[in-house]
């Protein structure tokens, strides 16, 4: 089966992902920061509303992926509470100052996830920020993680498709390779053909205006340039469109003899 994971930051978006045909969600907060650890309340609420897989982002702050000992301890605690809240998996990535995968500490967190409730682990796009993508894949394999999330080190999956294919060939079934980076209904079949991927990750966020009537024109509590009266959500139809395009991958492959 070709699997679809949708990145979400709310119960509303998680429900839309399931209704649209996704197999799992990556649950985060602060998607404007690239995704941070969600609250315990949000994890529990999402878990109670959907039946598909819930994979929780474990990232204590924005910025780089070099974490202090205090931050590492927080990540361990967050993995434990994600397990208690019913998560099926966790998502994280740790690098060294030199740009390599922090194998020792990543393996420790993988074991923590496995010990807590046999949760799966996705090593996220920290791998795309590493010094050497191919050797980093081998490092992640050594940690015991179940899959990596990658765009092939490029800004989009389309641009990084050649390297993604190389990673899939190098993985040799030892670890899953999930493709991300502007995956859309109009390009997913081409990405699948170019990479051989069978797992895809997408955000598909759409802007939705706030229903707030009164808006203080003299004060803004967000970052400069941000619109506090606009939020981004996942829409069921957008997920359904991507799922339908993905379902066409198998029929295309059978016709082409791939």
Residue ranges and their predicted role:
Residues 1-7, 11, 47-48, 216-219, ...:
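N-terminal amphipathic alpha-helix/helix-capping segment at the start of soluble metabolic enzymes
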Residues 1-25, 30-37:
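N-terminal pre-domain/capping segments
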Residues 2-8, 25-27, 54-58, 90-92, ...:
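Hydrophobic faces of well-ordered beta-strands that scaffold small-molecule active sites
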Residues 9-16, 66-78, 128-143, 167, ...:
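Catalytic cores of alpha/beta
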Residues 12, 31-52, 70-73, 94-114, ...:
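Active-site-adjacent beta->alpha loops and helix N-cap segments on the catalytic face
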Residues 19-25, 49-53, 86-89, 114-118, ...:
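Glycine-enriched alpha-helix->loop->beta-strand junction motifs that scaffold or abut catalytic
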Residues 35-62, 101-125, 161-185, 224-252:
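Alpha-helix-loop-beta-strand connector modules within alpha/beta enzyme cores
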Residues 178, 197-238:
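Active-site pocket-lining/capping segments in soluble small-molecule metabolic enzymes
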